[in-house]
Amino acid sequence: MTAAFDRYVSFKNADWEGKSQRVMERLQIHIDAAQNPFWAYFAQKRTELNQKQGLDDLRVLHNYLPTLREILEDNGDQETLAMLEDLEVTCM
């Protein structure tokens, strides 16, 4: 009998789901503002990756980490950038 694999076992007590959700909530502000074409693309890819490939938001954020970091820096959104960096250090 094979045990189910949990790739997030090392994140126990790291609240990766909560941290991912809070970062996504902050990013939604940028998506709604639609000041950069990337945000519409990112929102579409998030939906596709979540629904079609079964990837969670932590994986979606990881896939776009360099681009997100650059855009958040350019926008001066230090709060979301700090949240994203914390997520990267503790959970990626």
UniProtKB/Swiss-Prot annotation:
Query: One GO biological process from the UniProt record?
Result: nitrogen fixation
Query: What's its job?
Result: Is required to sustain N(2)-dependent growth in the presence of low levels of carbon monoxide (CO). Probably acts by protecting the N(2) fixation ability of the nitrogenase complex, which is inactivated in the presence of CO.
**UniProt keyword terms in alphabetical order:** Nitrogen fixation
Q: Which cysteines are joined by disulfide bonds?
A: none
Lineage of the organism: Bacteria, Pseudomonadati, Pseudomonadota, Alphaproteobacteria, Hyphomicrobiales
Q: Which family does it belong to?
A: Belongs to the CowN family.
Q: Where is the signal peptide?
A: none
Q: What is this protein called?
A: N(2)-fixation sustaining protein CowN
